Curated annotation (Swiss-Prot):
InterPro entries hit by this protein: AAA+_ATPase (IPR003593), DNA_pol_III_sug/sutau_N (IPR012763), DNA_Rep/Repair_Clamp_Loader (IPR050238), HLD_clamp_pol_III_gamma_tau (IPR045085), P-loop_NTPase (IPR027417)
Stated role: DNA polymerase III is a complex, multichain enzyme responsible for most of the replicative synthesis in bacteria. This DNA polymerase also exhibits 3' to 5' exonuclease activity.
Gene expressing this chain: dnaX
Primary enzyme class: transferase
Catalytic activity: DNA(n) + a 2'-deoxyribonucleoside 5'-triphosphate = DNA(n+1) + diphosphate
Organism: Mycoplasma pneumoniae (strain ATCC 29342 / M129 / Subtype 1)
GO cellular component entries: DNA polymerase III complex
EC annotation from Swiss-Prot or TrEMBL: 2.7.7.7
Name of the protein described by the UniProt record: DNA polymerase III subunit gamma/tau
Entry keyword Lipid metabolism: no
Length: 681
């Protein structure tokens, strides 16, 4: 029966192996010097030579004619090659991974070899062993006799217990380069009389993805395509359902041109042709990386020779290629880890250049050269009177304080005017930071301590209460803030800050009032956003209700805070919505009060809002009666839009819990290039 190519041409000695030269050198020296450990761990991708090396090592330590390599002629070598050696045990750890199997192995370890010098245990797919099995191996591995060697082969090194790692030597088998795979495929094709072009071999090596075994399997498969003519690149693409270069470049051009209709049309065509999308994504990523390098450097040599003609015809900005690279990586598993090492480095360079381009200015680094100070000249001593500095008659004025003109309130009710004054920036409430003020030497009375929400704490309140916290619901503590600007008159000078002290009390940041949020949201209310958020909320409530009926406890695990999610399931409706906030109506007053406070102070609560509504939002929640008494009148008195509430603090709050950005790079590309669904250009 004919052997498949990867079995027929599997290396049987060290000199036949490719791509793992450093590992080969270390192991050969260890065998020659008789300094083998009790165990080896071989980790790496499939088809990189782990099991092959293990079997060659088993021959090497038992070879009767060892001279830097195995002879493949002695009794030991031939027995191992034919899989009939009774002292070499090749175990499939994926199927024999139970504690009973390991106990049986441990009992036999201390028996002397029957025929050879050493016994070898090769455990393939070792990461499949159970924790109990690993525990059973610990003592055996540590106290193994000198005539026993363990070799663990795995594709998932991270699953090997640290206690095992500390008792073995670990080697990481890298993927075989495309050049080495192509060279080996050419040698095998010549020996098997397979007529195939160089371009076809290059494509097969690329399809192998660093696995020499996969490359030989692909060559074996394509060898049956035709017995009479030479196999070409087109034959390979047709056999394995691959895109030709015209189709790949056509797709990239459609995407980067913003032609959504053509892009979707091409994808549908690819699907009807049975295209291998797994390989297509990997090729698309690698090709886009090369095109970015070409456009950025102007050097066509960075693109593969077969793609250079098509690459020269494209006319796109490097930023567009960078965005496409990020979109593929963010939405699929085909990022840099699937590329060759050189392409991985190129992808890193793209990410760095793209990040640097967003920075407004990065100053050049100038190294500080330390020089030896010259010897000081002798200065005659002066009397105390002579040494006094001569002060000017009057210090020049560097700054003066002016008052910004007051803006008349657009709300008749003075209390409402305090509520709807909006912040310049927002301070996280629980931070309890203290705000230092610029010294005002011209003022006789203490200036009102201003917060960052457009309100000021009344001076008499500051004098009476000092540093004690203020109630956010009591509006009698506050008055409209007077903004003070520092304006340079002559030359700039450092601003002197007053340090906080008992004689100079400073303001304490206050929490946002939910009425403030509600009025701001209403000032920017968008009916489309109301419908959008209501739809998201209804969908969430349906799933939540269904999970409660079926007692599906796993449903709530997807949310950062199950209590916040449970509260939100009791919303009656979305009353108003803006890009930065929501107004929600509840029946339960306790839930409404608790929810808006937690949304401002609790990272898990804000993260749950982000998970349900898909963006960070200020939340204002009421019962219907509360809304009518606290907000409705103020909303009706609005004469112009209030300021927008900034979301930076909420984003920082939720980012401590939610690790992934909600908006992917693919969505960024869609926003940039796709100007509407199925639009004609």
């Amino acid at each position: 029966m004919r052997k498949v190519l990867y079995q027929k041409y599997r290396p049987t000695k060290f000199s036949d192996t490719v791509g793992q030269d450093s590992i080969k050198r270390i192991i050969v020296n260890a065998i020659t010097q008789d300094q083998l450990p009790h165990g080896y761990i071989f980790a790496g991708e499939r088809g990189t030579g782990k099991t092959t090396f293990a079997k060659i090592i088993a021959k090497a330590i038992n070879c009767l004619n060892w001279n830097g390599d195995v002879c493949n002629q002695c009794e030991a070598c031939q027995a191992i090659n034919s899989n009939s050696a009774i002292d070499v045990f090749e175990i499939d750890a994926a199927s024999k991974n139970g504690i009973n199997d390991i106990r049986e192995l441990a009992e036999n370890v201390f028996n002397l070899p029957f025929k050879f010098k050493k016994k070898v245990y090769i455990l393939d797919e070792a990461h499949m062993l159970t924790p109990q099995s690993w525990s059973g191996l610990l003592k055996t591995l540590e106290e193994a006799p000198d005539y026993v060697l363990f070799i663990f082969a795995t594709t998932e090194f991270n699953k090997i217990p640290i206690t095992i790692l500390s008792r073995c030597q670990s080697f990481f088998f890298k993927q075989i380069t495309n050049d080495l795979i192509q060279q080996r495929l050419a040698e095998v094709a010549a020996k098997e009389s397979i007529k195939i072009t160089t371009d076809a071999l290059v494509k097969l090596a690329d399809l192998a993805q660093g696995s020499l075994r996969d490359g030989l399997s692909l060559l074996d498969q394509i060898s049956n395509f035709s017995e009479s003519k030479t196999i070409s690149l087109a034959d390979v693409e047709k056999t394995f359902n691959l895109l030709d270069k015209e189709q790949k470049f056509g797709f990239i051009e459609a995407v980067l041109s913003g032609d959504l209709k053509q892009s979707f049309h091409l994808i549908d065509n690819f699907e009807s042709q049975g295209i291998n999308f797994v390989h297509f994504l990997r090729e698309l990523f690698a090709l886009t990386v090369d095109l970015y390098g070409y456009v950025k450097t102007g050097q066509i040599a960075v693109v593969k020779p077969s793609d250079q003609t098509m690459a020269a015809k494209l006319r796109f900005h490097p930023k567009q290629y960078a965005l496409l690279v990020q979109a593929i990586e963010a939405n699929t598993g085909y990022g840099p880890s699937q590329l060759s090492l050189s392409d991985q480095i190129k992808a890193i360079v793209i990410h760095y250049n793209n990040a640097v381009s967003k920075e407004p200015h990065i100053p050049a680094y100038t190294p500080v050269v330390q020089t030896q100070s010259p010897a000081k000249e002798h200065v005659p001593s002066k009397t105390v009177e002579e040494a006094k500095p001569q002060l000017p008659a009057k210090e020049p004025v560097l700054y003066k304080v002016i008052e910004e003109p007051k803006v008349s309130s657009f709300v008749k009710d003075p209390v409402a005017s305090k509520l709807i004054e909006q912040p310049q920036t927002i301070v996280q409430p629980e931070a309890q930071q203290e705000i230092t003020e610029v010294e005002q030497p011209t003022e006789t009375s203490p200036a009102p301590a201003t917060d960052l929400f457009g309100l000021a704490i009344k001076p008499e309140v500051v004098r009476k209460r000092g540093r004690r916290p203020l109630s956010v619901e009591n509006t009698d503590f506050f008055q409209p803030a007077v903004k003070k600007l520092i304006q340079p008159v002559s030359k700039p000078a450092p601003i002197k800050l007053i340090e906080p002290s008992d004689n100079n009390p400073v303001s304490i940041p206050i929490k946002l009032n939910r009425a403030v949020i509600a009025v701001s949201v209403y000032g920017h209310n968008d009916p489309k956003l109301v419908a959008h958020f209501q739809q998201l909320l209804d969908s969430f409530k349906r799933e939540f209700t269904q999970a409660e009926k079926t007692k599906d406890s796993s449903y709530l695990k997807q949310f950062s805070d199950k209590f916040t999610a449970s509260d939100l399931s009791k919303v009656i409706k979305v009353l108003a919505a803006s890009p930065f906030g929501l107004v929600l109506i509840f029946e339960d007053k306790e839930i409404a009060t608790r929810l808006w406070k937690e949304a401002l102070t609790e990272a898990t609560a804000q993260a749950t809002l982000l998970e349900i509504f898909q963006q960070n939002l200020f939340l204002s929640s009421f019962t219907l009666s509360e809304y009518e008494t606290k907000v409705l009148a103020k909303v009706e008195q609005l004469t112009h839009k209030p300021q927008v509430l900034q979301l930076q603090q909420l984003e920082q709050l939720s980012s401590t819990v939610v690790k992934k950005a909600q908006k992917t790079a693919a969505q960024e590309i869609a926003d940039t290039f796709f100007k509407g669904l199925y639009e004609e250009k």
